[in-house]
């Protein structure tokens, strides 16, 4: 629930992700609700088989099929699918291939996992993030600025360049900041200099 809440707030795409599943070994799978007709299911059974179906479509896909066909094992399930003479449509949770995400979508996915883990732990710890917008487009940058940083923790430390948090993003996040520091390397004196304020204010 925590993951889906923040992911939807940031990604803001319809029919992109419907649910998340985390197994006992902390393997994470994302799912989307998808409509299949009985002929599609029969073709899947005949063409790719049980093992490849579960790998491609996910554990929850089979859980839904077991419940809908009221069977308990795959042999009975496949027989039921093959013997189904009626044309029916089924809404099934289908695994999403994360490898097909764009670089920005993958980064948002990881950021949201961190957010969900922190919220689920119910432990308040500082959150530190470096170059938060590396592959993120402008729309999602604004969503991360307004929805993510101010809610992930009571103390968030953001290490950013002036091109990442530009003047537009800075105006959004400014009211929520406690302190700002500009850290620069002094080549002449071979040392790091720290000043109060952000790039636009120093």
Task: Kindly give the residue locations of the regions a language model identified.
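Charged, surface-exposed helical/loop "interaction arms" that form contiguous linear patches used
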Residues: 1-11, 15-16, 53, 57
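Nucleotide-state sensing region of NTPase/ATPase domains
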Residues: 7, 36, 41-43, 174, ...
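Long, charged, glycine-rich C-terminal linkers/tails
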Residues: 11-35, 128-132
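Conserved catalytic network of the ASCE P-loop NTPase/AAA+ motor domain
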Residues: 12, 101-103, 117-121, 148-152, ...
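GG-anchored amphipathic helix commonly corresponding to the ABC/SMC/Rad50 NBD signature/C-loop
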Residues: 49, 55-64, 84, 103-126
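Intrinsically disordered, low-complexity acidic Ser/Thr-rich regulatory segments
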Residues: 63-109
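ABC-family nucleotide-binding domains
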Residues: 130-141
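C-terminal lobe/lid and adjacent interdomain/linker elements of RecA-like ASCE P-loop ATPase modules
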Residues: 139-202
């Amino acid at each position: 629930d925590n993951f889906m809440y923040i992911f939807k707030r940031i990604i803001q795409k319809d029919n992109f992700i419907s649910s998340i599943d985390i197994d006992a070994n902390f393997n994470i799978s994302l799912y989307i609700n998808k409509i299949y007709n009985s002929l599609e299911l029969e073709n899947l059974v005949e063409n790719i088989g049980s093992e490849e179906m579960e790998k491609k479509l996910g554990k929850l896909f089979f859980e839904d099929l077991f419940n809908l066909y009221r069977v308990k094992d795959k042999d009975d399930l496949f027989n039921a699918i093959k013997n189904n003479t009626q044309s029916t449509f089924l809404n099934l949770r289908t695994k999403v291939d994360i490898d097909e995400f764009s670089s920005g979508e993958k980064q948002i996915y990881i950021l949201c996992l961190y957010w969900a883990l922190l919220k689920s732990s119910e432990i308040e710890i500082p959150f530190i993030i470096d170059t938060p917008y590396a592959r993120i487009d402008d729309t999602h940058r604004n969503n991360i600025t307004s929805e993510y940083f101010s809610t992930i923790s009571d103390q968030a430390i953001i290490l950013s360049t002036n091109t990442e948090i530009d003047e537009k993003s800075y105006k959004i996040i400014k009211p929520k900041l406690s302190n700002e520091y500009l850290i620069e390397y002094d080549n002449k004196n071979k040392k790091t200099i720290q000043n109060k304020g952000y790039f636009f204010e120093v």
